[in-house]
């Protein structure tokens, strides 16, 4: 499958996977890509399958010469679902912002290497973290 960006999906998936453990292939559909990060474990004493995490997720789609994205910060619960939530702990917030900015920069650089831009989606007005200048 070739996306509207004229780049084959299989090659993009390989490039996205090379960015690290962020790509969730099972949640990528057609021209919709899903990335996430389980940045901070809430309780390490629980069995792994019962743990919850603070983190973030990004969804992106191709559009003429660019990818647009939306992202959220929140809780990855023990059922394996993301819920957008306000982060009250400043240390957790800092960790989420740091990992999100780091990933965003690497994603932006990777897309630039194939002559694509990375931009917020037109309807994404409530950005909790400023990712680029």
From Swiss-Prot:
It holds the Pfam family Crl. One of its GO terms (biological process) is positive regulation of DNA-templated transcription. Signal peptide: none annotated. It is found in: Cytoplasm. Keywords: Activator, Cytoplasm, Transcription, Transcription regulation. GO terms for cellular component: cytoplasm. Its main location: cytoplasm. InterPro entries: Tscrpt_reg_Crl, Tscrpt_reg_Crl_sf. Residues 99-122 are annotated as: Essential for activity. It comes from the Bacteria. Binds to the sigma-S subunit of RNA polymerase, activating expression of sigma-S-regulated genes. Stimulates RNA polymerase holoenzyme formation and may bind to several other sigma factors, such as sigma-70 and sigma-32. HAMAP family: Crl. Belongs to the Crl family. This is Sigma factor-binding protein Crl. It comes from Yersinia pseudotuberculosis serotype O:1b (strain IP 31758).
């Amino acid at each position: 499958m070739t996306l509207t960006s004229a780049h084959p999906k299989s090659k993009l998936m390989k490039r996205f996977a090379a960015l690290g453990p962020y790509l969730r292939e099972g949640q990528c559909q057609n021209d919709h890509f899903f990335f996430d990060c389980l940045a901070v474990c809430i309780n390490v004493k629980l069995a792994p399958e019962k743990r919850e995490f603070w983190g973030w997720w990004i969804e992106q789609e191709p559009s003429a010469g660019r990818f647009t994205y939306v992202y959220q910060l929140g809780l990855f619960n023990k059922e394996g679902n993301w819920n957008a939530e306000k982060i009250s702990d400043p240390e957790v917030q800092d960790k989420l912002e740091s990992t999100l900015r780091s990933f965003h920069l690497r994603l932006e650089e990777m897309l630039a290497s194939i002559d694509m831009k990375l931009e917020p989606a037109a309807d994404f007005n409530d950005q909790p973290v400023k990712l680029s200048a």
